[in-house]
Amino acid sequence: MNHKPLTTAELAELTAGLHRLSRNLWWTWNQEPQEIFHDLSPRGWTNLYHNAVAILHEVSDYELRMRLQEPEFADRVRTVLKNFDAYLQSKDTWGAQNAPELLKNPVAYFSAEFGFHETLPIAAGGLGMLAGDHAKAASDLGLGFVGITLFYREGYFQQTVNADNWQTEYYAHLKPQNLPIEPVLNANGEPLVCTVKVATSTVSFRAWRANVGRCPVYLLDANLPENEPHQRDLTLRVYGGDTTTRVMQEILLGVGGVRLLRELGLQPSTFHMNEGHAAFLTLELAREKMAEGKAFAQAWAETKQQCLFTTHTPVEAGHDRFSSELMGFAANKFCANLKLSHQELMGLGRVNPADEREPFCMTVLALKGSRAANGVSELHGAVSREMWQCLYPGKKVDEVPIGHVTNGVHVAGWMKGTVRRFWRKKLATAHEQPDMSTTETTRFWKSKPLIDWEREINEPQFWARMADPAFISDEELWSLRYRLRRELIEFSRRRLLIQGQRLTQGDFITFDHMLNPDALTIGFARRFATYKRAPLIFQQFENIVKLAHDKQRPVQFIFAGKAHPRDDEGKRFIQHIIHLSKFSDLKGHLFFIENYDVHVARQMVSGCDVWLNNPRRPLEASGTSGMKCGSHGCLNMSIMDGWWREGYDGTNGFSIGDDTHPASIEEQDRRDSANTFKVLTEEVIPCFYNRDATGIPRQWLGKVRRAMTTLVPQFSTWRMVQEYTRKYYQPK
């Protein structure tokens, strides 16, 4: 069949559409645009680490025109652009129906880090990934939302391990022109520049805009020629530098963020602080009100009504504290602006304002400056009330005004392409061959066309179908699980080959035989903070070795994660695990994958059979990595802490221990290690290897079905953002 070539105007329209699409992070949680960018340059997709903007820079105009002249490819591009524009322009959203007032006066969400995708590595861990997922869900729901963070031009560190098995860090310079961000310009088409007073000088900053679907997230950037070198480095690295750098970063984030919003003409209804890093925004809001002639007491009371604070950790090191001397140097301008003495300013960040020895705590400032506060799980809310009761004299612990909203994950953003395509195909087949039953779930599906995939996979009714063998048989589910495990193993082999060749003369043959595609595969991947106890399971070393070497029921472990550059104890955990993987009887059964990031996480949560989580209770405020497993059929095996305490129901995974913990750290570690081994040997391994005559582990798949049904819709950021809206964003 002859197809009419595209005109110059048609080519220009599709080309412009692809460039526009590449600079909106919507493509990162939608499969079809990812496949288009991949097909434009399969090698570039790999070499440029899935960076759509960079791929369009790499592909020549001639190559792009030739691909667009292919009718099938051009049709795919048109369809994706049509869906993209329909998404952006839709007025029929949850936010429009349930919180229309926020479209005019949005929520301003401040976070020191945002994790969106591997192409924009400006997050250090779970706090940033939660912020990114929060923004994606707000976009999907059509909520009035704007994010504020910093643009770290070297991002978070890249990890390698040296010959001594010690973590080393290096930083890659991020080039804005190759990232899914765009400059914020003034009316003259020039970069919009704002200023903020830090210490004894003025810091200028510009902003970049990351389009997260419908929602903008602004990244403040101090790397301007008019700034001194140390000022430019305020936005060099995530959590980089010393405490002086940290307090200056936080002034820039909080004060600078408010000033940028005002320059943009935005009047947020709520300023949501994701951790205490941005708490200086409360002082800037009070300054604005005092500039209108109000006294500090009135200005502070009105500021509190605008602010919400989410605390994320009971770990002491997670709460920034600054000395009186440092505050006097870095934050002296606040005193003049607010007509406060230095001691009065310090009192805003102290539990006891009169205690001159007490440092200034950003969490205390955030709590004092907010109308409401919350923890990130039910247990964490209770722990936080006890932890901060000292700020509320006369109140019993259960009267402390700190609630909770349990975290979630953005299901579409974490769902691997293999699984997404599988469910799309299953749904299409189900609609072609409708079930004639009259159950509520069936009526739901017969009434909804397949036009909004993201909406469907966040509906409990979709996941309720996982319990129905008529919708998906055990054979199909087990085949999917095998494929995902196989993909993880192939990915791990490639990574291990690169790691091995850097340090030794390893060859592909050696690494191609690593990892058994039929073995029970247990994964552990997260920040190597010491309270997360990465090596805990290996306290039962001899017993674990026996399990790993069982030829009838083999077990293998894949670990990944980064320790903070200044956390030597976390680095020792990494060193210990790598040493075991190379020089102990666990060699060939234990593996460590370097440079943990979003891409590695997606491979692991999808391909592992079991997701191990053993924090020292109750220090895991929530945890979210285990939430990403459910949609892929990976089961959680976890201490009863954080989100798992709410998620586990006895049928949808495995519990290590119970809802208690001893006061002694040594006793807790000993008991948890023993319980981990007990659950592994008495529950996990027998359940996984108990096969019927056809080789299918029916009982195991029953747990997989229950996990999908009970966990995925409940622990999603769609549910989480809706809960924040009802509880905290909307005026009471």
Which residues make up each language-model segment?
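Catalytic cores of carbohydrate-active enzymes across secretory and cytosolic contexts
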Residues: 1-732
